[in-house]
């Protein structure tokens, strides 16, 4: 059940409880000495003896219930039976302590054989991250939280959710993906329920696409069998082979064939791509020149252009895949190009994350080090907020 140093830690904790379980075979000074005339035969002491025995039995029940609650695989049948029916009389305060102890332990250790107990779905934290840590992406802030939360709160979704993030490098695609992972799963990217694939790293050679398909299908199936809520992230999605993306088709069809339905009720596919980021920039620049404010730009201004351009792009497998052609992607989410003011905010956040003091002049210096385009307007940072941390190190050296 408990192994290594954990056993000593929990035994020490249990000693603090009234009537903590004693080692087997340990004798008590008052047992076997109740002959007439003995001090142990005093009626008051006998009542105390009975109360101590009852307290000891209760502590053993605490321990048995807690261990079976946290380590169900290691819980022996006789231990489960010893807990008695659910209605056994556990004092209210003791139940609260037990719940607190279980919650505390499960906050940093696995408590069940599946990864489900590590799913947090912290939508409040996700909302805070999107609104406070992400800059210049009002469309992402509006759409991602609403879409993901709505999907995960649907009792029986008809299909997996597919979101495709598009935009220039450094605009926040990977940043938002990490926010999702960290707020939906306690273990983040280390969660058994999350898988991340980088196209050029995991699937580098087109000639092995059939082998990659088998491997991908196997990993998806194993992850779904382990967790009822899974997340699969595909970085550099524009470099994925169209045949490889076919594997995902059955999960994204609204009425998938019976043999191809997702084994986990909730599955999210997240695609990250720089594909057609230039189109997003062109549309945004045109709207800004026409007098629109950045915050007035809507999905209707961008998504139709973005989707059409992705389909027409010749040199990428993602646009030619069945997922795009048959509209199996739920949302193409544009990440807008970042301006000078957004770069300053990224620099400020980088200082704060390292608990470093900064001056407003320093933020300006860092922002001015970035290259801005187009050549005439000098409006958008060509690298977004990428390399901000490295530039801060320059000021600290």
UniProtKB/Swiss-Prot annotation:
InterPro entries in the record: P-loop_NTPase, TOR1A_C, Torsin
Primary location recorded for the protein, binned into one broad class: cytoplasm
Post-translational events: N-glycosylated.
Residues listed as glycosylation sites in the UniProt record: 122
Subcellular location: Cytoplasm; Endoplasmic reticulum lumen
Phenotype for residue 236 to Q: No effect on subcellular location
Residues that, per the record, bind ATP: 167-174
A GO term, aspect molecular function: ATP binding
Signal peptide location: 1-25
Expression (tissue specificity): Ubiquitously expressed. Highest expression in stomach, salivary glands and lymph nodes. Isoform 2 is expressed in placenta.
GO cellular component: endoplasmic reticulum; endoplasmic reticulum lumen; extracellular exosome; nuclear envelope
UniProt entry keywords in alphabetical sequence: ATP-binding, Cytoplasm, Endoplasmic reticulum, Glycoprotein, Nucleotide-binding, Signal
SUPFAM superfamilies membership: P-loop containing nucleoside triphosphate hydrolases
Family statement: Belongs to the ClpA/ClpB family. Torsin subfamily.
PANTHER family the record matches: TORSIN (PTHR10760), TORSIN-3A (PTHR10760:SF3)
Subunit structure: May not form homohexamers.
Protein name, entry field: Torsin-3A
């Amino acid at each position: 059940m408990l192994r290594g140093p954990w056993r000593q830690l929990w035994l020490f904790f249990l000693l603090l409880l009234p009537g903590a379980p004693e080692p087997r075979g340990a004798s008590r000074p008052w047992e076997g000495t109740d002959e007439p005339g003995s001090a142990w035969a005093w009626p008051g002491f006998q009542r105390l003896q009975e109360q101590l025995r009852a307290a000891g039995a209760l502590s053993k029940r605490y321990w048995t219930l807690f261990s079976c609650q946290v380590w169900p695989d290691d819980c022996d049948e006789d231990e489960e039976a010893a807990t008695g029916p659910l209605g056994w009389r556990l004092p209210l305060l003791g139940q609260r302590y037990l719940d607190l102890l279980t919650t505390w332990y499960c906050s940093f250790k696995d408590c069940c054989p599946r990864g489900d107990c590590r799913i947090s779905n912290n939508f409040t934290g996700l909302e805070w991250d999107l609104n406070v840590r992400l800059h210049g992406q009002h469309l992402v802030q509006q759409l991602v939280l609403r879409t993901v939360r709505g999907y995960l709160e649907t009792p029986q979704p008809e299909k997996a959710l597919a979101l495709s993030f598009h935009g220039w490098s450094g605009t926040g695609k990977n940043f938002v993906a990490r926010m999702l992972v960290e707020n939906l799963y306690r273990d983040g990217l280390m969660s058994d329920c999350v898988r991340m694939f980088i196209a050029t790293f995991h699937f580098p050679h087109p000639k092995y696409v059939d082998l990659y398909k088998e491997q991908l299908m196997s990993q998806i199936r194993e992850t779904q069998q382990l967790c009822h809520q899974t997340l699969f992230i595909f970085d550099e999605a524009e470099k994925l082979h169209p045949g490889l993306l076919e594997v995902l088709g059955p999960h994204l069809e609204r009425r998938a064939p019976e043999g191809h339905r997702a084994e986990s009720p909730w599955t999210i596919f997240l695609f990250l791509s720089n594909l057609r980021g230039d189109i997003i920039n062109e549309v945004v620049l045109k709207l800004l020149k026409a007098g629109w404010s950045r915050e007035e730009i809507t999905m209707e201004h961008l998504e139709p252009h973005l989707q059409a351009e992705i389909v027409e792009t010749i040199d990428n497998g993602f646009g030619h895949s069945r997922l795009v052609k048959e509209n199996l992607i739920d949302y193409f989410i544009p990440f807008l190009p970042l301006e000078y003011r957004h770069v300053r905010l990224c620099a400020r956040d980088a200082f704060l994350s390292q608990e470093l003091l900064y001056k407003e002049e320093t933020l300006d210096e860092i922002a001015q080090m970035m290259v801005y385009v187009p050549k005439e307007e000098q409006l958008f940072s060509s690298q977004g907020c990428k390399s901000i941390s490295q530039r801060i190190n320059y000021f600290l050296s």
